[in-house]
Amino acid sequence: MASVTEQFNDIISLYSTKLEHTSLRQDSPEYQGLLLSTIKKLLNLKTAIFDRLALFSTNETIDDVSTASIKFLAVDYYLGLLISRRQSNDSDVAQRQSMKLIYLKKSVESFINFLTLLQDYKLLDPLVGEKLGNFKDRYNPQLSELYAQPKNNKDLSGAQLKRKEKIELFQRNKEISTKLHCLELELKNNDEDHDHDELLRELYLMRLHHFSLDTINNIEQNLFECEMLSNFLKNSVHEVKSSGTQIRKESNDDDSTGFTDKLENINKPLIDKKGQVLRNFTLVDKRQQLQQKVRGYGQYGPTMSVEEFLDKEFEEGRVLQGGEEPEQAPDEENMDWQDRETYKAREWDEFKESHAKGSGNTMNRG
């Protein structure tokens, strides 16, 4: 049987290679099946570590914990990551969203367990510890409790405070990531056994530090999604109740006097077959209404004739005007016009006789 360390390493490797980075869709049966089996393995491993083997105790410090056991403090962190990816395959959308809400809340609980465990061992970053202390109900935190809020509702500095805290977390996370990378390189190039154990212990502690900062981001994302799903489910229930009430009203018989509490249909015809008026109406010029909408918002087709369009273009000065005068049609019965054309032809003949072809510009060739 594999040791606890081997089981833990196998689960983390499986998460990194096939669950965190995968070509499968998260809602596919293959992915969810692998995810569920991994969660079960990690839960069994957690029971073995904390209950059966009792590797951790509330009356000890981190110095009392062996180097090989330090990484097991991140079990709840990985549980939170895995559970947040769970999805239901129910065909009903509301039921599917309801199950997702449950999974997200379970994920937040696992993240809180992880932070609480680090706090017990005095390993929690002060920024993270401050946020953990702001939760009124630690295992049921609200999105508004993650960041400092102004005392006065009229104070508009809430966004500025949130931005400031986010920048602090980001810079702190970046600093820890750099130290973690340096430790990994140093451990890889170190060959001495004594220094190797110290570097490995420091690496495990720095990794837990990095996980605690990342946990805040995961909690924020989960709470934001929980808020969206809660609003979605509330609206769905309200719509179902409204539609049920409407159906019950429609199923009741109409009043004998003809009274009804149903809303009138806008598309109801004006008159029935007998000529009786069914609803109030106002005589309007429909063509004029459509014409006014042509240049407004929305996609309306043209509702004017070509002549109207050209008149409008002329009014707005979009039509180019001017140019040469059009030639008048020749009037062969006009004697003056015939004389002018005759003289013009004679002049052209005389010009051609006095100017031989090719006698123009000879380009200095003689």
Swiss-Prot record:
Q: Which chain positions lie within coiled-coil regions?
A: none
Region Disordered: start and end of each range?
A: 318-366
What processes in GO biological process is this protein linked to?
Answer: negative regulation of signal transduction; positive regulation of transcription by RNA polymerase I; regulation of dephosphorylation; regulation of TORC1 signaling; TOR signaling
**Key word Coiled coil present in the record?**
no
Provide one Gene Ontology cellular component: protein phosphatase type 2A complex
A GO MF annotation of the entry reads: protein phosphatase 2A binding
| Acidic residues bias (residue ranges) | 324-336
Q: InterPro entries, alphabetically?
A: TAP42/TAP46-like_sf (IPR038511), TAP46-like (IPR007304)
After translation, the protein is modified as follows:
Phosphorylated by TOR kinases. Dephosphorylated by CDC55, TPD3 and SIT4.
Keyword Phosphoprotein found: yes
Q: Which UniProt keywords apply?
A: Phosphoprotein, Signal transduction inhibitor
- The UniProt regions of compositional bias labelled Basic and acidic residues, in chain numbering, are 337-356
Q: Which family does the similarity line name?
A: Belongs to the IGBP1/TAP42 family.
Q: What does this protein do?
A: Involved in negative regulation of the TOR signaling pathway in response to type of available nitrogen source. Inhibitor of PP2A phosphatase SIT4, which results in inhibition of nuclear export of MSN2, due to lack of dephosphorylation by SIT4. Also required for rapamycin induced activation of expression of many nitrogen discrimination pathway (NDP) genes. In complex with PPH21, required for organization of the actin cytoskeletom during the cell cycle via a Rho GTPase-dependent mechanism.
The subunit structure is: Associates with the PP2a (PPH21 and PPH22) and SIT4 protein phosphatase catalytic subunits. Interacts with PPG1, PPH3 and TIP41.
What is the protein's name according to its record? Type 2A phosphatase-associated protein 42
